[in-house]
Amino acid sequence: MYAASLVKELKNKEMIYITAIETYPNNAEPYCNAGAVAIEKGNHKHAKHLLNQAIEIDDLLSEAYNNLGIIAIIENDYESAASLFKQAKELGLNTNYNEGVVNIYKGNYDKAIKLMTKDNPNCDYNVALAQTLDKKYTIAEETVKCLEENGKTLYLQAVIAARTKDIEKSLKHLAKAIKKDNKIKNIAKNDMEFANMHDMPEFVALIE
């Protein structure tokens, strides 16, 4: 799939993999790669179909189980995700990071951090999230600072500031997050992380 590795546009990648499937219908890899593209496009039902086809052809294809595990996380089915990552790992794939993500949702924050940072740099959103949930606020703040500034990372910074009672900083980050992504208004409105700010005129002005 060298040609697809040179292509950045998802639609074009998808066409390359579809052509490969038509040309080599008994090769599992194009099905798996097309499934990965479908995940990126948000078409999870189609992705599962393609990945299961890949496994029917080659039930030792670790990436197919790994990608099905990613879909399971998206669908909030963490037990299935853990099982699929275990299968992928037994077939030789490094699944530390994805297992770490599962452990965030299971509430095993320290384990999640250790798994996600074992083979990856600390500069990662999910690492910062796990550190925040594990109440390691100083470390979490340093981690999130190295990330690209967008609505999601600014919102996490607002949460960290709210948890450490720095209301001014929380409002500042929240305002910047909303400016980046207006949908954050509705999220913040109902988020108990900001419960102690709900009656503040500055907060109300941000979420109106």
Segments from the language model and where they lie:
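Canonical tetratricopeptide repeat
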Residues: 2, 33, 67, 98, ...
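Structural marker of alpha-solenoid helical repeat scaffolds
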Residues: 23, 57, 88-91, 118-119, ...
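Terminal, low-structured helical/coil segments at or just beyond the last alpha-helical repeat
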Residues: 183-208
